[in-house]
């Protein structure tokens, strides 16, 4: 069966080549309609083989017919069929307000130490937004932060120790200039050389106090309770107090309930709605699952 099929293919190819040889220009157009699609396909394959590879790269010129060029190449994005919103994960990037002052300071330090940025080969962008994120302050960088970074660059053993000693006053100058830096990494790098003055007691350093750190402060920032709720809670605590004064020993649950702060489920749900985006509408598939 396979050999017969091969013979048939060879015969059709041979007939196609013969017809090509007879009249290369017009024979393809004058093929009889009754010969069917198989001969036509074989003719097309033969033409493709006969042409050099560079010429047959574009299929538009086959049969001399003009084909719409690059039909499926530029394809627009199909619209999402589901109605559910696209949920992106929350980005915990803390943008500090002090970033504008530190960018001004950065320009000053860049003019003071011209070799700091060039020694590292770090690009120094000229303009900064006022609300630029403080997390990017230590990555982009220049001057004041580039100086302490320079000391951590691995040096070749051939370089002399005098260079290291000459770098030390530069670092101290940079730390003097960088009083207002607000991101954690640069401040900690500046404090690598000299230890903090207030060791063993509470830290008084202005730089550490001014630093803005991303912190989850629990439920302290929840707006205060409505007055009617507050009055009911006060009544409840007073009734608990009178009940304990009457002499009956308090149960563990009552003792625990006394110290519970004024946080209820409603507060928690409001807090969740404020910090998390929970879509109100179910997706169609979820509705179908629930019905």
Swiss-Prot record:
Chain residue ranges for the region called Disordered: 48-174
Superkingdom of the source species: Eukaryota
Keywords from the UniProt entry: Phosphoprotein
Biased composition (Basic residues): 65-83
Pfam families tied to this protein: DUF776
Keyword hit for Phosphoprotein: yes
Entry's Gene Ontology BP terms: cellular response to hydrogen peroxide
Modified residues (Phosphothreonine): 142, 232
Compositionally biased residues, Polar residues: 132-142
InterPro entries from the UniProt entry: DUF776
Protein name: Oxidative stress-responsive serine-rich protein 1
